[in-house]
């Protein structure tokens, strides 16, 4: 059990007042830093270190190694390192240290997880609905649009009526970094949107948001996440449904069908092609079968190669 009364952690008390009052740090930042420095203080105390001035770059590397051994993820270790850097910077400003031992030390890189996607059969199961309830028409339209056009959750949530050109079958999106892009709307999504917009006024709109809550206001990010989760459960989807999964499925299916990485990059609004390239690793068996069938020198012999 971590001891919050250890000498090292007690030395950090003025730092929290400094962050709260002078730096106006959020409670979220304070809680994160406090949790990290408490854990490090305990680790160092058990190693016989009683002052922060005893910590050098070798000690910081040891902290990272110990954190890794304890099963801490790469992102958590990176946060721990940031908390240490900021704490040592404070001690330098207070003239209690002359060198920041955490500067120049890198946290381990997080392994890139392949996005999970829903296969075409499951998409059909998910997006099949005979309900005429206004809220169901809204929910189906959201999911059809996200899968049809690869929207981010923030893009879907921020969508206004003026952003859509239904006659031209396209939608204008404001993505990360306020970058604007225009993407096409598929026929199924267009049908679902028209059905929803026909009943949208029943929600007594308070603004121009495309997707409204029952009070007529814009649906929140969290509400959209909950709507999709419940819809997935209702439709019998085995895995947990969240907005990113629909975007990932759009990207995967588009890439499998077209093989055009640049086009998928444009549709997703990725500024860096490397971000899109993660989808090239998806469904390797599917791609390998295409390669075996198409490449003239890909015919594999049953016997072992020498």
Swiss-Prot record:
Domain of life, source organism: Bacteria
Main subcellular location: cytoplasm
CDD domains linked: INT_XerDC_C (cd00798)
Tyr recombinase domain boundaries: 113-292
Core-binding (CB) domain: residues covered: 6-92
Residues forming the catalytic site: 152, 176, 244, 247, 270, 279
One Gene Ontology term of the molecular function aspect: tyrosine-based site-specific recombinase activity
Keywords for the protein's UniProt record, in alphabetical order: Cell cycle, Cell division, Chromosome partition, Cytoplasm, DNA integration, DNA recombination, DNA-binding
Subcellular location: Cytoplasm
GO biological process, one term: DNA transposition
Keyword Protein biosynthesis attributed: no
Family stated for the protein in its record: Belongs to the 'phage' integrase family. XerC subfamily.
Assembly mode: Forms a cyclic heterotetrameric complex composed of two molecules of XerC and two molecules of XerD.
HAMAP family on file: Recomb_XerC_XerD
Protein function: Site-specific tyrosine recombinase, which acts by catalyzing the cutting and rejoining of the recombining DNA molecules. The XerC-XerD complex is essential to convert dimers of the bacterial chromosome into monomers to permit their segregation at cell division. It also contributes to the segregational stability of plasmids.
Protein's name according to its UniProt entry: Tyrosine recombinase XerC
Species this protein is from: Actinobacillus pleuropneumoniae serotype 7 (strain AP76)
Gene name of this polypeptide: xerC
